[in-house]
Amino acid sequence: MSTPTQLSYKDAGVDIDAGNALVDNIKSAVKRTHRPEVMGNLGGFGALCELPTKYKHPVLVSGTDGVGTKLRLAIDYQKHDSVGVDLVAMCVNDLIVAGAEPLFFLDYYATGKLDVATATSVVNGIAEGCAQSGCALIGGETAEMPGMYEGEDYDLAGFCVGVVEKEDVLDGSKVVAGDALIALGSSGPHSNGYSLIRKVLEVSKADPQQDLEGKPLIDHLLEPTKIYVKPLLKLLEKHDIHAMAHITGGGFWENIPRVLPNDAKAVVKGDSWQWPTVFNWLMENGNIAEFEMYRTFNCGVGMIIALPQDQVDAALTLLKAEGENAWLIGDIASRNGDEEQVEIC
């Protein structure tokens, strides 16, 4: 009688040794993101973090997000570190809108077969995003799931927790008619609208490696999402900020109203900035209407800030000193009846 074949987890497609190799590869990158509030090291069942002692009435602010179908382009063109930055940016930029300082970040990486080099590149990008935002990469999960993903495909999710003083929470309630609106420039499409971007590439039959303003089109499309946390924390220390809107999926039409009272509308001056070339390329090659562009993409504006008119000059000076491309983009007006809450003129 033959002896039954002994099966292992590796025979089923899950390589524990590869997972351990990944952990070893990322330890130094994770260490760079350490904050003094973090207790313990990688490898525990739960990650521990104290609240910073400077807060008297701390409020925790949480956020979760992904990178969407930008991942498809990243996988196809083997550019994995940038999507790690994207993952962090999409979460921490949402937290800063509430006035919150990001404390810690966790990631979820899922794939059918773990490629240690690819995963290392992704997590190194995540660590870079955490370093840019002053946030500790406190833990994560790597899920190798045979039969769930094709080939080299993988998916990402990020989770972030920040803290803000209770009396300093930004919720849009302070916004009033007459407030000024400052814009912060984006680095490109960030992490939104990529299903449409991929459709434009398909329909136009454009070569993603073609030159656009001195570098390949694909490099414009995979440019990491800009992280605004550190300059905005400095701005919040110095100025009476009434609201901030992170321009993500839904563009101008969907995101700005999220931080406006019902009786207020944002009047945006469309001639106050020039769209980065990549957006003009998408609009032309996809035959996309202007309304749809503003509904899908950030069109060069990653963040909008509402504040009193008399603080505009000082705020712009601070933001530019921090390296931001910042400008006056419009103001807040009273809204009558069923008027739209965003007007681009």
From Swiss-Prot:
Transmembrane segments: none annotated. InterPro entries: PurM-like_C_dom, PurM-like_C_sf, PurM-like_N, PurM-like_N_sf, PurM_cligase. GO terms for cellular component: cytosol. It holds the Pfam family AIRS_C. Its EC number is 6.3.3.1. GO terms for molecular function: ATP binding; phosphoribosylamine-glycine ligase activity; phosphoribosylformylglycinamidine cyclo-ligase activity. Keywords: ATP-binding, Cytoplasm, Ligase, Nucleotide-binding, Purine biosynthesis. It is found in: Cytoplasm. It is an enzyme of class 6 (ligase). Pathway: Purine metabolism; IMP biosynthesis via de novo pathway; 5-amino-1-(5-phospho-D-ribosyl)imidazole from N(2)-formyl-N(1)-(5-phospho-D-ribosyl)glycinamide: step 2/2. Belongs to the AIR synthase family. This is Phosphoribosylformylglycinamidine cyclo-ligase.
